[in-house]
Swiss-Prot record:
Listed GO CC annotations: extracellular region
Disulfide bond sites: 5-35, 13-32, 21-51
Superkingdom to which the source organism belongs: Eukaryota
Gene Ontology molecular function: any one: serine-type endopeptidase inhibitor activity
Annotated protein name in UniProt: Ovomucoid
Native source organism of the sequence: Nothoprocta cinerascens
Segments forming domain Kazal-like: 3-51
Residues of the site described as Reactive bond 3: 15-16
Length: 51
């Protein structure tokens, strides 16, 4: 599974809840929050859902 993070980072994210687990073992609330972390911290997707 991959997440397309082109167009990120964004200045603000919605409150939509669709959890993604990052390689830093942190659960991100949605694609926007995850993709911002990808750009800032070079995180990768571990799996969909909470960590």
């Amino acid at each position: 599974v991959t997440v397309d993070c082109s167009g990120y980072p964004k200045p603000a994210c919605t409150l939509e809840y669709f959890p993604l687990c990052g390689s830093d073992n942190q659960t991100y609330a949605n694609k926007c929050a995850f993709c911002n972390a990808v750009v800032e911290k070079n995180v990768t997707l571990r799996h969909l859902g909470k960590c």
